[in-house]
Every structure is written in C-alpha cells, then in structure tokens.
Curated annotation (Swiss-Prot):
It is found in: Cytoplasm. Residues 1-18 have a biased composition (Basic residues). GO terms for biological process: translation. SMART domains: Ribosomal_S3Ae (SM01397). Component of the small ribosomal subunit. Mature ribosomes consist of a small (40S) and a large (60S) subunit. The 40S subunit contains about 33 different proteins and 1 molecule of RNA (18S). The 60S subunit contains about 49 different proteins and 3 molecules of RNA (25S, 5.8S and 5S). Residues 1-20 are annotated as: Disordered. This is Small ribosomal subunit protein eS1. One of its GO terms (molecular function) is structural constituent of ribosome. Belongs to the eukaryotic ribosomal protein eS1 family. Keywords: Acetylation, Cytoplasm, Ribonucleoprotein, Ribosomal protein. GO terms for cellular component: cytosolic small ribosomal subunit. The modification N-acetylalanine is found at residue 2. HAMAP family: Ribosomal_eS1_euk.
Amino acid sequence: MAVGKNKRLSKGKKGIKKRTVDPFTRKDEYSVKAPSTFQTRDVGKTLVNRTSGLKNANDSLKGRIFEVSLADLQNDEDHAFRKVKLRVDEIQGKNCLTNFHGLDFTTDKLRSLVRKWQSLIEANITVKTTDDYLLRLFAIAFTKRRPNQIKKTTYARSSQIRAIRKKMTEIIQREASTCTLSQLTHKLIPEVIGREIEKSTQGIYPLQNVHIRKVKLLKSPKFDLGALLALHGESATDDKGQKVEREFKETVLESV
C-alpha cells in the first residue's frame, strides 16, 4: 500500500463558516464642528478606526474634507443651491475642528441659470487674503433686458463683455485681498460681491444672477492652532490661573 496523504481525511467539513467580526466595533465616533462664521456649528458625526499601536485616530481624521449644504449651516433654505467644503485641521477630545476649504454651486442650479437670448459672462481670478490663503474665485453673470426694451434678445457686444469681465476681476480682487479668510466667508454667504458687481456694471450692460459660483483653495499658510481656536470661538490661553494677591509685609531696615 502506497504511503501518502489521505485526501478524504484531510478535507474539512463543508458549510462551516469563519466567524465574522463587525468592523464597527473597532471604530469611534467624532463630532464635526463648523467655524463660528456659520450659524449651525454641529455638522454631523464621522467614524474612524480606534487608535491601536502606531496608527493614531487623530492622524486619520486630520485632512478629511466634508461637503455640507449652506442651507444646513445657515438654517435658511434660500442657500440650498450652495455647497461648502470644510477641512478638519485639529482634534480636541471627540470634536473635529474644521476650517473653510471651498465653495461650489449644485449642478441643477447652474443648469437652471443658463437660458436662451442672453449672454453668459464668466471671470476667474487668483487672490491672496491678508492671512496668506491663496484662493481662486470664479464669478458668473448673465445679461438682462433694459427698462422698456422691446427686443427679445439681450446679447452684449464683445467689447462690453470684456469691460464687464475687467470690472468683475477688479471688484473681486479689491474685496478678497483686503480681508482674512473668515471675513471673506462672511461676504460670500450674503452674496455681497455679486451685488457689488451688478451695481457697478449697470452703465456697461444690465446684469442679473451675478454670483461667485466657486471658491477653490489653492494654498494654505502654516498651521496656526491659536487662529483656528479663535475661529471656533475658543482660546488657547484659557488654562491660565488667576493672579494671587500676596499679603502685605513690612520692610525691615538693616540700619537706621
């Protein structure tokens, strides 16, 4: 009889499955906090694998980008067509402190703005804020009928489009380069820049639906924890103790 393995004996029983471990048992839940620029601070929750060995949970969370509707952040449905990107920069306890990372329009809103019989004017410019954030802002505008106009179309001439585009870039440059990122966010929420462009270009050609449709963050300065905590309404110097007043002691003279 030949000596060898008995294949029938070495086979295991069919149907026995490996015990599966639920991956969510190894995860922790963290709260995502928006900057104090927005009305609603609580964005939501995010999951991350618990710290084990050399893998730190905080390192996995830092740099995560969340896309949130501006309507949820401002409690106003009028802002539903705008999306804000928030980037996690610091972890404090179970809270992820975020900073502004960009802004964009929803696709359906952009498609609804483009119509027949009008000119579409676009402009983009790269600006640097006073706190050294390098941003690229994209503006969009559409021509509209003049008062008492009978003509169906509202097409602007090439020279008028160039003049409007020049005016748009000048206004964006002026408004964005003279403020911090937080102050610029305050301007973007109520469409301050769009209204300023619409008002300034009335003499060239009347405009409508003027928006900063997209903000792209190109470069951030060196991370500053104090600035981030100030943005979230906190302070890095909260742990300082109170000044203790010492009792008065009489001075003793060595010689009269």
